[in-house]
Each structure stands twice: as structure tokens, then as C-alpha cells.
Amino acid sequence: MALTVKVITPDRVVWKKTVEEIILPSSTGQLGILMNHAPLLTALDIGVMRARMVNTWVPLVLLGGFAQIDNNLVTIIVSDAEEVKAIDEEEANKLLAASLANMEKAQSNREKIESMQNLRRARARMQAILSLK
């Protein structure tokens, strides 16, 4: 028996797989989930979810949301998610550099918050790409 993981965005099911273990980017840190985990509802931060299928770890970029764990079913509801195979490394590097530059230029509170969110997303994308190397 294993965990069934569903990653859902407002407009589609992004990912549905059976895995042995997942590590979630919760708002309080990394959260590991194995079979028969106690029921749980947790907030998710921007970051990389890692799922272990047999002996392979598969990363998925999550952009904040919630996860519900119950009876070996993990339902993840996020504002957006990206599979690593859909991320272009060169574009991700450019986005990271642009995000860092925008962070330095931000003046208003709104600009600072938006640039911080964009920077966190760019870092998560690069972290996911680098985890495959």
C-alpha cells in the first residue's frame, strides 16, 4: 500500500500519482509524509514538494496552499504548481536575476511584497531544477 497524491489548482488536476513518501513545504518547515500518517490539515508555503516513487525523487514546485492528509490520500490544493519538466532552466535563471533586481528596486510595501513573492517562486523553480542534477 502507498500514498495517493493529488495536486489541484483552481482550474485543473496538475499531478496525480501513487508514491511511497512525500516532503511538503509547509508554512512551519519541511513536512515528511509516509503511509498511515495521522490525519492532518496544513498550510503550504511556496516551495518544492518532493515525492519518492520507488527509488526516484520527483520534485514539483508549489505556490502556496493547503494539504489534507487522511487515510493514505494526500490532497494538495494550491494556487499554482509546476512540474520540473515544464521549466526552462535558462528562463528560470533569468527570472531569478530579474526577481533579485526588482527586490532591490522595490520601494512601496506592495512592491516589496510582490517582489518577495516573485523571488521565492523563482528560487523554488531553481531549487527544483537543481534537485534533478
From Swiss-Prot:
Keyword Magnesium appears in the UniProt entry: no
Subcellular location as annotated: Plastid, Chloroplast thylakoid membrane
Keyword annotations from UniProtKB, A to Z: ATP synthesis, CF(1), Chloroplast, Hydrogen ion transport, Ion transport, Membrane, Plastid, Thylakoid, Transport
Top-level taxon in the UniProt lineage: Eukaryota
GO cellular component: chloroplast thylakoid membrane; proton-transporting ATP synthase complex
InterPro entries per UniProt: ATP_synth_F1_dsu/esu, ATP_synth_F1_dsu/esu_N, ATPsynth_dsu/esu_N
Membrane topology note: Peripheral membrane protein
SUPFAM superfamilies assigned: Epsilon subunit of F1F0-ATP synthase N-terminal domain
Record has Plastid as a keyword: yes
UniProt-listed CDD domains: F1-ATPase_delta (cd12152)
Gene3D superfamilies: F0F1 ATP synthase delta/epsilon subunit, N-terminal, Helix hairpin bin
The family this protein is said to belong to: Belongs to the ATPase epsilon chain family.
Function as written in the Swiss-Prot or TrEMBL entry: Produces ATP from ADP in the presence of a proton gradient across the membrane.
HAMAP family: ATP_synth_epsil_bac (MF_00530)
Subunit structure: F-type ATPases have 2 components, CF(1) - the catalytic core - and CF(0) - the membrane proton channel. CF(1) has five subunits: alpha(3), beta(3), gamma(1), delta(1), epsilon(1). CF(0) has three main subunits: a, b and c.
Protein name: ATP synthase epsilon chain, chloroplastic
Organism: Cyanidium caldarium (Red alga)
Upper lineage: Eukaryota, Rhodophyta, Bangiophyceae, Cyanidiales, Cyanidiaceae
